[in-house]
């Protein structure tokens, strides 16, 4: 595993391999989150040979030990770890070292490639975060949209820690935002997500977090926008109910007035609904 570190790095999207063309909504989101995070700098650590296989750590000046790993959205076909850097200042102010983790994208890399990248990114954080004020046993994972899906899947599946020499409780808790928890039948998607690969791959079952709920899973703090995509609101409600039915502690928050994009922006507002609640939740767990 490659783990070369570079300090004070902001990698431009122009330095990455080409992605699928953005939708109009995606292009607007891309421009906005890069604008919001343009002054945030951190330490970049590669965990693989592909440019997308890297994490950026933004330390807190007064770390309390909690660590938050953020995974970007983009429909599994778009996005950069730099998208999430705008979240760092508000969480840093709460004493939380912030990590944004990149992963390879579809359609070139279909499931489970990007998911496995996320797991390797968690392993890199576990091995490095103590140098930056974080406690490896206080690692929380979250993300927006597709990133929320990947965070939930990593928290629920328990077949990946041992091969990476990680403790079974390496994930302290999960905080997905506007995520997808069912990518198969009944998901509400207008078309089959491209990251699943060929229709006969059977990936829907393996890739759906709701299929991996286990009674000893870590706790969840699930958020979504009041005006989010209807199928994601429904999925979020059903996911929280399923977690609770399995005996897993699950807190939820509906972000007032937020649509899919502004739910993401809300996670960087120190005086908004998400940052104070999520920071408190991490401290308590």
Annotate each predicted stretch with a short phrase:
Residues 34, 179-212, 218:
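Mobile cap/lid helix-loop segments that gate and shape the active-site cleft of serine hydrolases
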Residues 120-188, 204:
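Primarily recognizes the serine-hydrolase "nucleophile elbow" in alpha/beta-hydrolase
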Residues 65-75:
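Short beta-strand element of the alpha/beta-hydrolase
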Residues 216, 222-224:
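Short beta-strand/loop motif that positions the catalytic acidic residue
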Residues 80-100:
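Short amphipathic alpha-helix adjacent to the substrate-entry channel of hydrolases
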Residues 223, 237-240, 244-285:
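C-terminal catalytic histidine-bearing segment of alpha/beta-hydrolase fold enzymes
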Residues 4-62:
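N-terminal cap/lid segment of alpha/beta-hydrolase-fold proteins
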Residues 229-238:
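Conserved alpha/beta-hydrolase "acid-adjacent" motif
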């Amino acid at each position: 595993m490659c783990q070369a570190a570079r300090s004070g790095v902001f990698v431009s999207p122009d330095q990455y391999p080409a992605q699928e063309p953005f939708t109009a909504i995606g292009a607007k989101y891309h421009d906005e989150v890069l604008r919001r995070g343009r002054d945030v700098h951190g330490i970049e650590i590669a965990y693989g040979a592909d440019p997308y296989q890297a994490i950026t750590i933004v330390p807190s000046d007064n770390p309390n030990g909690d660590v938050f790993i953020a995974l970007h959205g983009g429909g599994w076909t778009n996005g950069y770890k730099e998208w999430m850097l705008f979240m760092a200042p508000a969480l840093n102010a709460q004493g939380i070292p912030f990590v944004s983790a990149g992963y390879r994208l579809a359609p070139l890399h279909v499931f489970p490639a990007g998911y496995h990248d996320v797991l390797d990114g968690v392993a890199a954080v576990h091995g490095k975060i103590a140098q930056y004020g974080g406690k490896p046993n206080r690692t929380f994972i979250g993300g927006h949209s597709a990133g929320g899906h990947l965070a939930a899947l990593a928290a629920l599946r328990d077949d990946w820690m041992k091969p990476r020499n990680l403790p079974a409780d390496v994930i302290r808790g999960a905080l997905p935002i506007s995520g997808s928890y069912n990518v198969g039948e009944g998901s509400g998607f207008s078309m089959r997500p491209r990251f699943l690969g060929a229709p006969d791959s059977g990936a829907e079952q393996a890739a759906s977090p709701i299929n991996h709920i286990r009674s000893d899973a870590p706790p969840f703090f699930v958020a979504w926008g009041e005006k989010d995509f209807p199928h994601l609101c429904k999925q979020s409600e059903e996911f929280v109910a399923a977690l609770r039915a399995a005996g897993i502690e699950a807190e939820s928050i509906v972000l007032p007035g937020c649509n899919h994009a502004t739910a993401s922006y809300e996670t960087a507002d120190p005086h908004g609904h998400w940052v104070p609640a999520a920071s408190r939740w991490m401290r308590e767990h």
